[in-house]
Amino acid sequence: MMLAREPKYLSKYLSTLVPRLAIRHRGLWIILLLAFTNNLASTELIEFRKGEHQLFAEVALTASQRSRGLMWRMEMADNMGMLFILEPQSRQCFWMRNTYLPLTIAFLNQDFKIMQLNDMTPLSEELHCSEEPAHFALEVNQGWFAQRDIQVGDHLEATLR
């Protein structure tokens, strides 16, 4: 999965996002701090929880990580995904070029509230755009949210792992 349009003002956005997240999401604050110092490893994970359900997401923060996304992967564990940190001032679009896994994308606001869910077909260049500006996009195996009765309007809890 690839971000079809890269954020142009990511550092400006992150500088305003960090103070807000420091108050609400201590784990994500640490991830953003590491990103500013270029120490973010591709293996850093955020744990998302909704009730008893748990998901671990790799963080795609650099331009390279965002453009590669989940491309070329042939499998992904059921409780894994990828989190994209977005520029929230505009709608964001994703496609499935060179992505072999059927995915569901969740567009999230700054509080990790699910604003929109879209199922995406492997290897398709159809754009899947957020209906409203989103702060994050979370890609998971297709059906992960539906199988757990997690819906638009639900909030996810996030913690650095």
Show which residues each predicted segment covers.
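Short N-terminal alpha-helical targeting/association segments
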Residues: 16, 30-31, 131
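Compact, glycine-rich, soluble single-domain proteins
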Residues: 42-161
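Bacterial N-terminal signal peptides
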Residues: 24-37
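N-terminal secretory signal peptides that target proteins for export/translocation
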Residues: 1-23
